[in-house]
Amino acid sequence: MKELEYPFDSGYLLKKKRSIKRQLLSDGSVRIKKKIAVLGGSTTNDIINMLELFLLNYGIEPIFYESEYNRYWQDAVFGNEEIDSFSPDLIFVHTSNRNILKYPAITDSKEQTDALFAEQMKYFETMWEKIAERYHCPVIQNNFEQPYFRLMGNRDAFDCRGRVNFINRLNTAFADYAASHESFYINDINYVSACYGLDKWSESSYWHLYKYAMCVPAIPDFAFNLAAIIKSVFGKNKKALVLDLDNTLWGGVVGDDGVDGIEIGQETHMGQVYAEFQKYLGLVKDTGVMLTVCSKNDEENALAGLNHPEGSLKPDDFIMIKANWDNKDRNIEAIATGLNIGQDALVFLDDNPAERAIVSAQLPTVAVPEMERPEDYIRVVDRSRFFEITAFSSDDLKRNEMYKENAVRAAQQAQFTDYGEYLHSLEMVAVIDDFLPVYLPRITQLTNKSNQFNLTTKRFTTAEMEQVFADDSYIRLYGRLADKFGDNGIVSVVIGKVNSDTLDIDLWLMSCRVLKRDMEYAMLDNLCDRAKQRGLKTVKGYYYPTAKNKMVKELYGDFGFTKVSEDADGNTVWELSLSGYEPKNKYITVERNK
């Protein structure tokens, strides 16, 4: 089909993929059928849909197995009955730089970065060896695209602590593995991702006609990058960031929306954007750049926003906080004086174009980049190369003596043959507690989107959830799970109604992101403990089957409940006596919200 030949129109294919598939399947072609298992470290549905079109066009009719989100390593190393019965003809491991478990820290030694590299390679080699041992089929593995920011600028490419350097080492090691193993192939997304932009950069006519190594329109970008190195060599880097708060570090206005109304964290897509920006700023801080705040806010509200549980930047991360109703240019002058640096060493970040214009007019030596879209904040700051690093010493670390950003990941897993040992190695910590107002939007969202691990599939509106929150006849639990690789956010919700000496579980759900981690046992232990504290004797659970929740059909039975009834539609009722209940959680340390 012409539409699937290079050069193709990506937008057209994405828009018309269903009709194109129908045309291909009805064209009378004879195709070989092949079973392809896709083990994904990110969402793979649209990849599979598009891959199917190209394969059909090549005369291959694919049958796909798609792993659960980010379960690629566990499925490969510990096995999966579904994949075993699927018996794939080929396995594709779709990972990206988002799946690198830990990058070198700016404080790491060469020995530490080498050890981290060895651990990362062991992680993947363990997976590849298990796949080869179990499935005996070809394997296609992505290498890694370049990172979306360079913390040290061009030094990232040759400093062992740089992300660019670390990814390049991994890509070379992946290539060496492929060269020495039959039926193992690299999907070179490092090249493909670069090619998506490199095509314009490397326009061959500029070389053949003028011997330019790049197209003329790219020369300003080249010169800007070169100038960043030169200005760093001669001591002209910026030294401090001056940060607005509302709609800069989080979405919304904390004074109007309240702490529980601002967007930060995993609950919304914009909350994730702001959370990622805060984490990036924390990394910048670790290089010695000073962080300050200049915000039109009551100080109480500003501090409350900075103390939001989903934010990674806290008040202690900032050397100075100017949260008042004075003109921002005056506050920035005070910050420069307080830090004992020139105004030309400051970078002011603010989403408000009026505030940016005033500061630019009143303080012309302060750098004021255009901050239009939150999704672009990291790109704007990083590619402006305000803090290009050409040398790095311990003195740079001392410049900013506040707490460094907490490490989001620790040493990665080595090979495990016992799943229990693997769970222990995760060092999981759960916060399980009664609902908090700040989490009600996320809890409500979970009730309306969780389908697989959801025993009753009961939905709640915001108003209904607020009623549950205010009613003491309910036992309510939210659970958030973190491990040494990061925080999963709120992943489980249980709501039980107290009726006499019995607790009726109206809702039990859990995010599929944490399946097979024993979080359900931690929730059950906590639920039973609270029920006992209220003098209850029995817990009743209900399972209402849907097209998507069959995976939890026997959950209460696995918990030790006794099935007491089942109707013609498959709805079941289960009971558990609290007398003599023994805790079941073995692997998770449980805390209450602090």
Predicted regions, residues:
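Extracellular glycan-modifying ectodomains
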Residues: M1-V242, L249-W250, G255-G261, A354, ...
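Basic, amphipathic juxtamembrane/active-site segments
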Residues: V254-K279, P364-E372
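Substrate-recognition element of Asp-dependent hydrolases with the DxDx(T/V) motif
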Residues: Q272, E276-N307, V359, R442, ...
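Substrate-recognition/cap helix-loop segment adjacent to the acidic, metal-dependent catalytic center
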Residues: N297-A323
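Conserved Lys-Pro-Asp/Glu-containing loop-to-beta segment of HAD-superfamily phosphomonoesterases
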Residues: I332-P353, V359
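Terminal substrate-recognition subdomain of acyl/acetyltransferases
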Residues: G338, S360, P364-L426, D529-K594
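A conserved beta-strand-loop-helix scaffold within acyl/acetyltransferase catalytic domains
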Residues: V431-S511
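Acyl-donor binding region in acyl/amide transferases
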Residues: K484, I490-D567
